[in-house]
Swiss-Prot record:
SUPFAM superfamilies: YggU-like. Belongs to the UPF0235 family. The lineage of its organism: Bacteria, Pseudomonadati, Chlorobiota, Chlorobiia, Chlorobiales. This is UPF0235 protein Ppha_2415. One of its GO terms (cellular component) is cytoplasm. It comes from Pelodictyon phaeoclathratiforme (strain DSM 5477 / BU-1). It comes from the Bacteria. PANTHER family: UPF0235 PROTEIN C15ORF40.
């Protein structure tokens, strides 16, 4: 199960990113968080932007509402989805874990 927290009315969870993949997608669970494949290379913040875009599409919100709180230069990232409660996020992320 995905470990979700709530911070100021926004869902927060951990993501393990795998850059330079053949396509961008959510793969499933990884140590209480989500594992994602990202097509972009980790250069010039491209993989971080793609990670935010991936979750914005998944939650059907603008990319500006998805933030990486920590791990900008790491494969393990803490992601916040602004304006989405942890309960609502759990429903969206349920198919992945």
């Amino acid at each position: 199960m995905i470990e979700l927290r709530e911070k100021n009315g926004s869902a927060v969870f951990v993501v393990k990113a795998q850059p330079r993949s053949s396509k961008s997608r959510v793969c499933g669970l990884y140590n209480g968080g989500l594992k994602v494949n990202l097509k972009a290379a980790p250069v010039d913040d491209a993989a971080n932007r793609e990670c935010c875009e991936l979750f914005s599409k998944l939650f059907r919100i603008p990319p500006s509402r998805v933030h990486i709180l920590s791990g900008q230069s790491s494969r393990t990232k803490t992601v916040m989805v602004e304006g989405i409660s942890s309960k609502a996020a759990a429903l969206v992320l349920e198919p992945f874990g």
